[in-house]
Structures are given as structure tokens and as C-alpha cells.
Amino acid sequence: KEGYPMGRNGCKISCVINNNFCKVECQAKWRQSDGYCYFWGLSCYCTNLPDDAQVWDSSTNKCGG
């Protein structure tokens, strides 16, 4: 599984071309994952996630920002 990790506010985690920051964010939530900064979305994107990982979904978006 893969997807955008969410911050405490339910929003995607913003980044500006900083893959290491995103890798740390992803691994803080899911140890075996990897992550990078998705340039077009300016948001962190995680890969190699467990099937039950909760990631941002446009259909259930509760982001207030």
C-alpha cells in the first residue's frame, strides 16, 4: 500500500523537494516504510505501507486547511 500520510489536523504533510524529511515522517508512523516528497503535490508520499495504514483520501478528506 502507499499514500499520503496525514498530520494531526488530517491534512497531507507539506514538503518542498525534501525527500529525507518525508522519509523520516513516513518511518515515524510506519517503521518499514519509505517516503519522498511528491513534487507536483508538494506533499510527502509514503510507500511500502501496511494494509491497515490510514492515509489521506480525497473522498474522506477532513483537512481544515
From Swiss-Prot:
One of its GO terms (molecular function) is sodium channel inhibitor activity. PROSITE patterns: LCN_CSAB. Its main location: secreted. Disulfide bonds join C11-C63, C15-C37, C22-C44, C26-C46. Keywords: Disulfide bond, Ion channel impairing toxin, Neurotoxin, Secreted, Toxin, Voltage-gated sodium channel impairing toxin. Coiled coil: none annotated. GO terms for biological process: defense response. One of its GO terms (cellular component) is extracellular region. It is found in: Secreted. This is Putative beta-neurotoxin RjAa1. It comes from Rhopalurus junceus.
